[in-house]
Amino acid sequence: MVIRGDNITVDFAGATLQGTPADTAIRIDGGKNVRIIQARARGYKVGILARGTRNLTLEDNDLSYNWKPRLFSLVEHESLVDWLSFHHNEKDEWLRFGAAIYLADVAGGKIVENGAVQGMNGLLLVRSNGLSIRGNNFSFNSGLGVGLYRSSYDTIVHNWIDYNVRGYSHGFYSRGQDSADLLIYEQSSHNVIAHNSLTHGGDGVFLWAGQTTMDSGTGGANDNLINENDVSYATANGVEATFSRNTITNNRAWGNEYGVWGGYSFETQIVGNDFTNNRFGVAIEHGRDNVISGNRFLHDSVAIKLWADSIEPSDWGYPKHHDTKSRDYRISGNTFVDNHVVLEARNTTGLDTLAAASPPSLSPPHFSAPTTPLSLRDRSAIVVDEWGPYDWQSPKLWPVDSTRAVPLRLAVLGPPGTWRVVSQRGIATLSKTSGRMGDTLAVTPAKDSTGDWEVMLEYKGQQFSYGRFEPPIRWTADSKSLPRVDFFSYRPGHWSLQATGTVTLSPGFYTLRAISNNAMRLYLDDKLVIDAWTPHESKVDYAEMPAGQHTLRVEYNQTDGWIELRVEIIRGRPEQYTLP
C-alpha cells in the first residue's frame, strides 16, 4: 500500500497485510499530518516505510514477525558471519537489514503503542527529528530495538525495548555482535531517553559519535539525556557512549560486563546511577573532564576504571584533532559496597577524588522504568537460536551444556504447565517421558543413530522438538582423524588445513554448507563446488550434495587474524537456504 497526500488517516481496524520478504507492507511518500492506526503486517522485509513526511502518527500497529536472517553462531562458539555493522547509512544501507518501521527525513509526530517483536529490527530513524516515541514494545529482535542515525531532538520514553540481542550463549560466550536495544549513531544529538526498559540487549544503549567525527574530529552524538532507564543484563555494556558528551543519570545497570563504557567521552555526567554486579561499573579510556558522582557501586568486580593507552590507532582522525589524554575527572559522593577494586587508574592525571565516597548505603537510587518478570531475570534468560532471541512465550528445548555432551541435558523452557514425550527417533534412553516446564531432560542417542535423532514433546497441544542431523564424515588431516571440520579461534600467523572425508547419505536431498573466512576451497568427489579462495571476511556458501557415498576435500589458508572454518551437511536443497 502506498500513501501520498496531506491530512490522511488510514485505520486498518486490525486487518492484516501478509507479504513476502522482499516487499514493504505500507509506504508513505511525503505529505503531512498522516496517521496509520491498527495495521497488522506479517512476513515483510519492511513493515512501514515513510520518507519526507511531516507530523506522522503511527499508533497501535502490530508489525511483529517480519523478516529476520538466519544466524550461524553455535552454543559452543559464535560465528563472525553474525556480526553487524551500522556504521554507514547515507544511502539507506540499513534497509538491507529490514525493519518493522523505517523513517527517513520525517519531521515531527508520534510513534505510540506499536509492537514489533521477533524480527531483526524494530524502529529505525534516519535524519528524523522531533518525534515522540512512547509506550511501544520493540523487543526480542535479533538486531536493534530502536536505531537512530543523524536523528536529533527525539523523545523516547516509557517503552519496552528488551532482549534485542544476538551473539550470546550462557556459560560459553558473551559478545553481542553489535546488537542493541537502543542504538544512537552518527551525529544524533539532543535526544531524551528516559524511563525505558532496555534490558538483555547486546548493549542496552549503544551510542557512537559516527564516522564523520572519527575522520574529522568534529561533531558527535552529543547532549543526549539518558535518564532513569533499566539497562541491566546486557551481554556487553549497559550504556556505551563514546567520542561524545552526554548525561547519564539515575539508570539501573545490573549484571552487565560494563555498566557504562565511555571510551573517549568528554564533559560527560555519570550521576546517580545504580551499578550492581557488573564486571566493571564505569570504564573510560582516553576520557577527559568527566564527572562520576552520586552513584552506587555494589558488588562490582571493579567499580571505576580509567586509563589511556600509549599508542592510539593510526587510522583514526579523531586523536589528531583532540587532546585524548585521560585527565581531569571529578569523582564525588559515590557509594562503594563490596567491590573487589574501587578505583583503578592508569596514565590518568587530574583526578579529584577527595570526596569520592559517601557513607555506605544499600538503598538503591530513585528509579522509575517499566518492568516485566523477564526484564528482571539475569543473563541466563537470554537464549539465542538460529532465528534470534527466544521470547519465553512458547515451549522450547535447549541444551544446558555443550551440545557434544552425552547424555545431552535439555532444559524444557516455556510458560508454566506440563509436558509429555509424543515421539522419539534414534534415541537409546530418556531420563523421563513427562514432567513440568522447567525440567531437565537427559537424552542418550542410540549408537547406531548415525547422528540423526529427534525427541518431540507436547505442551498444551503444541508440539516442540530438539534433534540433531550430523551425518558422520570420516575426516583425516595429516594422517590424523578429525571428529569434524569446525575451527574457530584467533591466532596471528598463517595456519592452513587440508582435510579429506568420506560420507554415505541415504536417499534424499542434501546441501553442503561451508562457513569460512580467509581463503577456502571445497571439493566434492574431486570436483570444485565452492571456490572462496580470494581472501574474504566470514561468509556462508552452499552447494548441492547428492545422496550416496562421496568424498569431500577442504583446503583452507589463513591470511590474517581470525580463523573460521566449518563444513557441514544439512537437509534440503540449497535454494531453501539462500532465499532473501
Where are these regions (language model features)?
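Short, well-structured beta-strand segments within conserved domains
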Residues: 10, 34-35, 159, 191, ...
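Extracellular beta-strand-rich, repetitive "passenger/adhesive" scaffolds
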Residues: 12-15, 39, 61
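Acidic/polar low-complexity surface segments
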Residues: 20-29, 47, 57-104, 110-113, ...
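Extracellular/secretory pathway-exposed regions associated with glycan biology
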Residues: 444, 454-511, 515-580
